[in-house]
């Protein structure tokens, strides 16, 4: 990667599903050997806290240690499944357990409270809960470039207004209280 950076073919690179320890080790190696360090990470983060990973080897950065690490280093985060597998689209209902991966990874009382709060703020701001979920990511205290994987074009249409939604510190805290 370093040769491509030096040749100007890329301007930044990083890791996906890497632990923060592995990321730091790679950057220590880069520094010790005069190479370009990693500047971005693609691990999971969403307003809905994940309780399991969809596949072996996946990494989250929702824990306090990872959040502090991101704030301190200002590493750009490209969170995959930033819409929590459609949790905020209306697909997630406590009584509907037909999507076993959604249930395994995201169903919890805490996340359904977050969904209710996202719905409340969405109604007040004239957007959908998916837009609030996107705005929450964009208001983190480090660079975030959320990756969404909509199943339908309607999910893109309801999410993108989140690019313009402003959330106060109080609203950010309310969503995760």
Question: Predicted segments — roles?
Answer:
Residues 1-176:
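Beta/alpha (TIM)-barrel catalytic core signal, keyed to glycine-rich beta->alpha loops juxtaposed to Asp/Glu
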């Amino acid at each position: 990667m370093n040769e491509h950076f030096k040749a100007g073919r890329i301007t930044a690179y990083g890791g996906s599903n890497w632990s923060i320890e592995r990321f730091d080790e790679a950057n220590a190696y880069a520094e010790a050997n005069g190479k370009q360090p990693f500047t971005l990470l693609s691990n999971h983060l969403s307003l809905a806290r994940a309780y399991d990973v969809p596949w072996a080897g996946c990494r989250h950065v929702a824990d306090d240690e990872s959040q502090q690490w991101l704030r301190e280093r200002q590493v750009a985060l490209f969170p995959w499944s930033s819409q929590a597998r459609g949790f905020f689209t209306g697909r997630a209902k406590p009584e509907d357990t037909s999507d076993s991966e959604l249930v395994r990874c995201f169903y919890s009382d805490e996340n359904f409270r977050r969904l209710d709060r996202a719905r409340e703020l969405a109604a007040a701001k004239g957007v959908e809960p998916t837009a609030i979920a996107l705005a929450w990511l964009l208001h983190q205290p480090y660079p975030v470039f959320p990756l969404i994987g909509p199943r339908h074009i309607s999910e893109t249409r309801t999410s993108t207004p989140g690019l313009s939604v402003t959330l106060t510190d109080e609203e950010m805290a309310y969503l995760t209280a």
